[in-house]
Regions:
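C-terminal all-alpha effector/ligand-binding and dimerization domain
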Residues: 2-9, 20, 128, 177-227
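Short, flexible helix/strand-to-coil boundary loops that buttress conserved ligand/catalytic motifs
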Residues: 80, 90, 98, 164, ...
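Short, flexible turn/loop "capping" segments at secondary-structure junctions
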Residues: 45, 78, 144, 188-190
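Short linear motifs at protein or domain termini
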Residues: 1-114, 224-227
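A short secondary-structure junction motif
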Residues: 35, 39, 167-178, 219-222, ...
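Mobile beta-alpha loop/short-helix "lid" or hinge segments that flank ligand
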Residues: 72-77, 167-170, 186
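A ubiquitous short alpha-helical element
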Residues: 90-94, 109-113, 132-135, 176-183
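Conserved amphipathic alpha-helical segments that form helical-bundle/coiled-coil interaction surfaces
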Residues: 115-176, 191-199, 207-218
Length: 227
């Protein structure tokens, strides 16, 4: 392998945050989840435990346990050769993910609105101000995740929230494709997020659900435009 090819390979690796020594299993899992949720992995990527351990700067054991959880949640596919595969892009899979997100996240939003407080709405606004101040071009994936889970965590649902989190781990690889799409610069980052907040202020459940549905559908439409 030439120096140029090694350099290219390093450039294409996902950016994973190094892991502190304490609580390695949970920290490795959370670091990998963040990478999935922010589009660091693309559909069809092939990974190994050793590669992930090297990126995280830890031993294989905590990475193996973190990966086992991600396989169970559908974010990774384990193979007999011990190679890990990120599920490939597939139109049917994408449609199922969209339908699941629309249904489950709508339910979680309903529960969150039933517990609505002024402080919660202020916290939602703060996630958008942080993103706006950062001056990102195109969608800010970390702040997008922060907004949605500030919204959903308020529901305090032990049943629904883990299901939504698992859906986002699977959806996150599509964000990788969206960020590379020629239309990404045309995406208005928070237009539907602000619409959700305004609906929350009014106590408008239907308006909030409609804005959330538009937000979810828009990202999938980039990858599979309507005929």
């Amino acid at each position: 392998m030439t120096k140029a090819s090694r350099a290219q390979g390093a450039a294409n690796r996902p950016r994973l945050a190094p892991v502190a020594p304490a609580s390695l299993r949970e920290t490795a899992y959370r670091s990998l989840c963040e990478a999935f949720n922010t589009g660091q992995f693309a559909p069809g990527d092939t990974l190994t435990l050793q590669m992930l351990a090297d990126q995280l700067g830890i031993s294989l054991t905590p990475v193996r346990e973190a990966v086992r959880r991600l396989v169970a949640e559908g974010a990774l596919i384990d193979t007999p050769s011990r190679t890990l595969i990120v599920p490939k892009f597939d139109r049917q899979r994408m449609e199922e993910l969209k339908s699941a997100r629309l249904a489950l996240e709508g339910l979680v939003l309903d529960r969150a609105m039933a517990r609505s407080t002024p402080e919660w709405i202020v916290a939602l606004e703060a996630t958008l101000r942080t993103s706006d101040a950062a001056g990102h071009k195109g969608p800010d994936l970390r702040q997008n995740h922060a907004f949605h889970f500030t919204l959903y965590n308020h529901a305090d649902s032990e049943v629904l929230l883990p299901m939504v989190q698992a859906l986002w781990l699977q959806y996150g690889t599509y964000l990788n494709l969206i960020m590379k799409h020629p239309q990404v610069g045309r995406i208005a980052d928070h237009i539907f997020h602000y619409a959700i907040i305004e609906a929350l202020r009014r106590g408008d459940r239907d308006g909030a659900r409609a804005a959330l549905a538009h937000d979810i559908e828009r990202s999938f439409r980039v990858l599979a435009p309507d005929p």
